[in-house]
Every structure is written in structure tokens, then in C-alpha cells.
Amino acid sequence: MTVLGNSILKKEAWDKVTGAAKYNVDEVVKNIFHAKMLCSTCAHAKIKSIDISQALIEPGVKSILTGNDCEILFGELIDDRPPIAKDKVRYYGEPVALVVADCDQTAMRAANLIKIEYEQLPVVNSVSEATKENATLIHENLTDYTFESKYVYPQKNTNISHIVKIRKGDVNKGWLESKVVVEGSFTESQADHAAMEVRNARAEILPDGTVLINTSTQTPFTVKKYISKYFKLEESKVVVHTPLVGGAFGGKACVQLEILAYLASRSVDGRPVKISNSREEDIATSPCKMGAEVKIRLGADNNGKLKAAEMTYLVDGGAYSNISPRLAKAIAVDCSGPYAIENLSCDAMSIYTNHSYSTSFRGFSHASHAFCLERLMDKLALKLGMDPIQLRINNAITVGKTSPTQVKITKSNSGDLVSCLEKLKQIMNWQEGNKIELDNGKVRTKGISCFWKTSDSPTDASSGVLLTFNSDGSINLNCGVVEIGPGSKTTLAQILAEKMKMPINKINVVMNINTQTSPTHWKTVASMSTYMAGSAVLRAAEDLIMQLKKAAAVALKCSSEDLDVGNMRVFLNEDPTTYISFKDLVYGFQYDNGNTVGGHIFGRGSFVMSRLTHLDPATGIGKAAPSWTLGAQAVEIEYDKTECTYRFVKAATVIDVGKLINPKSAMGLLMGGMNMGLGIGSREEFLYDKNGIMQSTSFRTYKMMRYGENPEYVVDFVETPDLSAPYGARGVAEHGIIGIPGALGNAISLAADIDVDKLPITPEYIWRKKTGGKNDTY
């Protein structure tokens, strides 16, 4: 191999670092109007009246929309969400009106002139409140909604939008075999994606009825589908453009502003209208990372072998279901972690609350459940008097075992956790111990965790690729993968260059997405772009090679079986000096007398998920995804015993990548994920008061890590090829975040001598755990 395994610079790197890269808000459009939302100041209330009369007469105002102007309900799995609240609001920050004006300032000024009368309703402020008997219902008519999937199971007259059950083995037998039992209850807060580029969209309706949507999204083809479906438009009349996206982390997989932009444009006779969140709106109004309340019980024999597990996950899906049923499913599918547990029971539920609604977030719920499980693994090790790494090695899932949904484990579909743990021991200098007392009243501790993650795609998720030639023989790669930052399109170019045996600088990648001309790609989520689009790239390349050989065989008067490709040539296997260059073939081969044979050569490739199944609703048996990526992580901290504060010293990840395609790109992804994991683990959270009003709506109150707080980051790799993936490569984009909160929790538990059971782990939380919050010293 000549291209794979090399740290190729991202195709868009120079444009980004020089400021030449264009994002959605950078495009200047003449005669454009601007839309601004008026958002709810209540978390749960009836809308008694809306008076827009004063706002309508404000100079420059073109249109004002309320919930009465759009009767649709939409959603990813359950159609429960209005674009603009109608009759009642269900979370603080929910859009209640949309003002269209000639500039942002006018729209904001007019929005503040709208008068709304609310009638307060009881606020459901946590999933435990939501699941109490006789709890206030957030969606009184839940089972009357339209369901986009028959595999969603809402519970009538409750706040439960979905439940996933895993029943594996005989749990009662497992408890009888368990000599050591540990259990815990955990709480995790909602949080923000905090992408550099806020969500934004622009819509225009052309005179022929064509709808143009320009948006910063991970899911342009879903936007197209929704606009077409819910507004009864022909799909051919909806065109979505997506340029480079300035960070997403799952937060731009949800369709929200695109629908508002379309409604705004429709209200002003199709004129272009732009809507862009402020940072405060991006935090409070758009969807967020899920929160959760969790209970887990683990049983093991005296040797530390896991014998039984019972788990209950209540996912805080917020006011609308959106993707939260899939978040619950993702937890259930991987609930054992990368451990062999033969007797297992898990209930994972997505719950309505009067909080911001949840969407996908890097790791897709796995960081939440890994934190809980890994805390209990450390508690089990402590109770057994066993080294935490050795306990995990003893229970690592291996060939022949089964996943929670009873898929048989192979090296190919999982990887090598033990090798990851052995490498991690060396990186963390584990032999010196995981707790070292320092002379200055501080202590240095190390916490570890393991992770695994599979995807949660539809059973028929697909991806397409189109390859075209330029006259010089270079290739254009066109696919529907959105470049959201991880370098996906560079990875695809490396896969293509490897297959074609040609220089990667001769591969030109189409960065912008146009749903009219870009081949469809399900969504740029789930760390599946390399797997899905990479497979389509290989098939498109095979199509190219077949055509090139066929055309060259005519020109060289030989069999196509006698030919091979490389270095932008088609040549004879037995004599590579006899060849025809790509540039002389791709538009047809011309003889000296002018006769031309062949024609324009282009390659088509497609991929669709195969042999996946839905889960059995009673047992969870089924194959939800093709394979896993697994690994081990560690965090080292220095803890101040007097102040209950700590600083990060080191964070490390060892991951089984299958086949390493671009080392520096992978390292950057994983380091970024570790940084996010430390932020979620140490400080990032949504704070709500007793009335459900969010208190952390800006970067002044929503705390994030500072540059100087970053520790040393270390990344290493294990390579166990996934035989179903392009060149064996596994997805890695999300995995850097997954185990870090758990490793941090284990390090702090050891340092402060407390049982960490909540995220984030702030100094105040540590102090309260140590003192009960009753004393200012201890």
C-alpha cells in the first residue's frame, strides 16, 4: 500500500487556515430578508393569546408567523413537534413567533414588541418526575401522533416516548452465581454541542416553485425529504446546498431552522430569507446533548468474572422526541460495554421533560452509559481487591461471545480490547501505581475506562459515489458526505487513490453538497462515512477500472484480463512499458487517422447496509449494525485535598482502528474527542431552575475548558481489520469522547475518596460529597 497509513493533509486545509473557505453564512445574497425567532420565556404553559399588531407596523417588517400559520407536526420518529409552538409551549426557548424583516436589527426589535399571555402549567423538571405515577403529561395525546417508524413504542398516558428491552440469558441464575455485587445510581446533565459555527439556514422559492435551501447541516438529504414531505412538494422541486460546515458534533443532524427559513420565505412570496441563531439561541432553542438518570447492578464471582447485570436508563429527551428513541436504543444495544456478560437485563427509555429536546451528540449516548458502567467496574475492582485493568482484561469480550442483542463476536466485527489495555498500561506507567501521594498536600491519580460503539443506522441506510475524469486524467470524487471537520473527504480520496494506484493530488474532491447533483448519502453521522461512502468509492473505482481496461484492450488489441492500472495508466501486466495514459482514454481513444473508439468514462458506486435487522421488542435480539469500534482510555489528574480542585495531567486513548488510513487525522479526531469528554466530565451542563428556566444560556454561564487547562494527550492504535469495511478501517470520529468521563470519574473517586455518581464533576460537587454540603471545611 502506498497511500493508506500516510498523514495526508486535509484537502480543504489551506482554504481553512487562510480564511478562504466559505461557510453558509459567508455567501452574500442580494435583496435578502432576515428572520428572527421570539422564544418562550416559560418551560410549560398554555398560550392564551399572541398580539402581533404593534410588531407588524414596525418599519421594515415584512411578515410575522405564529403557530397558527403552520399546522404541521414533524419529527424524526414521532411527529410531535410544531415548527412554531401552537396552543402551548413545552420548553424554555421554544419558538413562539417568527419575524421577517429587512434586517436582523429590525426583526429583533419587532419581536420584542409581540405580546404573549401565558397560563403556567406544572413543570416536569427531571426524568424521575416524568415517570412518577400521575405525572403531568407533556404530550397528552402521545399515541395519536403519526409515527415515522413502527418500531417506536410510546406508552399511552405516560411521558415515555419509547422503550427498548434487552433480555439475555438467565439473570436470576446469574445473581445466584454472583458472590460480589455492586450497584449505583447516576445522574447526567444535558449539555451543548458548542460548535464554532452556529446553526443557520437560508431559503428561497423560485418562480417555477423550486425551493432552494442553503444550510449548515449534517443531513442535507433529510432536509430535502422533510421539506418535500411535510409541505407536500415534489422532491425534484427541493434543492439543498451545504458547503463546509464549521463543526457539528451531531447537533446539525436535526432539521429545525431549515423549516423556519422555508416558512419565512413562503410568507414573503418566495424572497430569500436567512435565519441564523445567536449563540444564546443555539444553546437554548436548538437541540442539545441528552441527560440521563441511570441505575445499574453488577454481579461477579470471587475471581471477578461478571455473572449478571441489570440496568435501567431514563434518557432525558426533552420536550420533543426527535432522535431520543434512537439514543435509548443505542444504549441498549451496547449496554454491556466491551465485556462478556451472559446474563443481562436492560430497560432503556426515552422520556419527555420540559427541557430542551435532545439530538445526537458525539458518541451518540455512549459516553453517558460508559460513565455509569465504568464507575461500577472500578467499584467492583475495589470490592474484589483487584487491579482495575486486570478486571477489565478478565472480562473483555472475545471471539465466540455474544453482544447484548446476541450477535456473535468475531475479531473482525469487534477488535482486540486486551491489546488496547496492555498498551494503555505502558502509556500511563501503570506499574508505578494509580495513586501517588505528593509532598504539597496533593495527590496524583489515574482512572481508566473501556468503550465500544456500533452505529444506529436504518437497516437500509445507503451511500452513493460518482467518479468523473478531467481531460488530464485526474479524477473528481463526488459524494453526499458533508465535510464537518474530521477530514472525511480526504479519507475517501485516500481510499480512491489506493484503489486506483495513483497520486492523491490527482484526486479532486467536490466539497459542497447539492442534493440535485450529489449522490445520496444517508447522513454524515455515526462515524459511518468511511464505512459507507468508502465502500461506495471502492465499487465506483472498480467500475472505472473495468471501463478503462475495456477501452484500453481495444486500443492495445489484447484482452482486458491482461491489463492493470497504476500511475494514471493502463498497462500490460507482462510489459508495463506498454501502456495508454488515462488522459488518452477517458473521453474516448483516438487513432492516428482520427477514428475514435469508446467514450466518456465515469464510475458509479453504491452501498447499502445489508443483513441488519430490527430488534425484537421483548428480548432485543437482532443485528442493529455491522460492527464495533472498541478501545481503552485513561485520565491522570492532580487533586488538591484542601480545595477539592483538580487539574488534568494526561489523557490517553488506545483504539482498535482496524486499518489506520490517516494517522494524524485520526489522532486529531481522538484528541478533540478527549477534550470534549473532559469538558462534559468536569464542567459542561445545562442548569435549570425549579420552573424549568435554563440558567446557562451563554458562554459566560455555560462553562467550557480553556486552552491552558488541556493536559498532555496521547493516542495509540491497534489494528485488527474489519473484513466488511474498506481496507479494514473502522470508524473513529466519535470514539475519543466515550470513555473519558468514566475515566475521569474513576480518577476523582480515587483521589477524593468519594463515590462519583454525577456528571459533571465540579469542585462544588466533590465538596458536597465529602461534607454533605453542611460545612465549609472538613
Q: Which functions belong to the PLM regions below?
A:
Residues 102, 270-317, 535-564, 568:
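Phosphate/diphosphate-binding loops
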Residues 6, 12-15, 150, 154-201, ...:
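Glycine-rich loop/linker segments at domain edges
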Residues 138-231, 396-474, 695-706, 714-716:
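Helix-loop-helix junctions that connect adjacent transmembrane helices in secondary transporters/permeases
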Residues 74-78, 110-113, 215, 224-226, ...:
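Short acidic, glycine/serine/threonine-rich loops at helix termini
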Residues 244, 248-275, 488-496:
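Thiamine diphosphate
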Residues 86-89, 234-242, 267-278, 282:
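Conserved catalytic cysteine-centered active-site region
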Residues 1-155, 269:
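Flexible, low-hydrophobicity surface segments
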Residues 67-68, 232-237, 266-274, 327-447, ...:
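C-terminal catalytic domains of large/alpha subunits in multi-subunit enzymes
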